[in-house]
């Protein structure tokens, strides 16, 4: 005999059956049992493994792990990208298709960067998520149409705040580093305006933020922001924003 194996979204199929017959009263699941003898639910995917698979499949290695980037002290970009992506995706419960689209977009960004560019891997992934979920606010962020307090209040509407917190006192999450990159680059975009932003106060015994943010460890965030200023040497996000918006020429084939 012939055995048919069906891969379906049962909930959507039940909705389609009800729509076809024009009634919400139909027991669609019982109707399907006429045709389906055995059901098997696929296990939830291992997000960390899937992110690593997409990293290899779209050949991120060719760019992020190039000899020139390693010589320029950028060897941590791979780890930052994978850790941040994994933290966000686990918290957001994205579908596999959504995850793939995020990685494709991220790889396209890298294709328009040279090996000498700072690519802010954690921030880039976060900005692509913001652009996907709320494109209007994304435009406000990159066009300096928000105050710092408005940006602080907007972040929890996109990302679960637990991704920014680590119980360990010795380290921070990749997402917190991405948040620090966001505030750093946001401040850099105001650098040549009449109202430049100062994010930290280093005159005290411990670094302190000059703004109020309740959902992260303020000392860790202040230290991460100071780390951004030291590491990126006042570089901004101009090139990355153009690459995210697909306005820069492609320099590399995927």
Please state what every model-predicted region is.
Residues 1-76:
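The catalytic "switch" region of P-loop NTPases
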Residues 47-48, 55, 63-254:
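The feature marks long, low-complexity, polar/acidic/proline-rich intrinsically disordered regions embedded
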């Amino acid at each position: 005999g012939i055995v048919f194996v069906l891969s379906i979204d049962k909930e959507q199929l039940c909705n389609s059956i009800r729509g076809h017959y024009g009634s919400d009263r139909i027991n669609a699941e019982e109707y399907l049992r006429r045709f389906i003898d055995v059901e098997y639910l696929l296990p939830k995917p291992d997000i960390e493994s899937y992110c690593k698979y997409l990293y290899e499949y779209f050949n991120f290695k060719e760019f992020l792990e190039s000899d020139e980037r390693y010589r320029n002290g950028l060897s941590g970009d791979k780890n930052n990208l994978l850790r941040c992506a994994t933290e966000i995706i686990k918290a957001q419960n994205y579908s596999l298709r959504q995850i793939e689209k995020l990685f494709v977009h991220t790889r396209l960004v890298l294709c328009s960067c040279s090996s000498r560019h700072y690519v802010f891997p954690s921030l880039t992934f976060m900005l692509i998520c913001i652009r996907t979920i709320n494109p209007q606010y994304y435009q406000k962020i990159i066009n300096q149409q928000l105050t710092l307090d408005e940006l602080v209040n907007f972040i929890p509407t996109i990302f679960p705040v637990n991704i920014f917190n680590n119980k360990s006192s010795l380290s921070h999450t990749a997402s917190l580093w991405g948040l620090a990159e966001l505030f750093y680059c946001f401040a850099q975009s105001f650098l040549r305006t009449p109202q430049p932003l100062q994010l930290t106060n280093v005159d005290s015994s411990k670094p302190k933020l000059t703004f109020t943010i309740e959902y992260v460890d303020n000392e860790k965030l202040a230290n991460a922001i100071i780390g951004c200023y030291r590491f990126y040497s006042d570089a901004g996000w101009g090139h990355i924003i153009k690459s995210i918006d697909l306005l820069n020429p492609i320099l590399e084939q995927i």
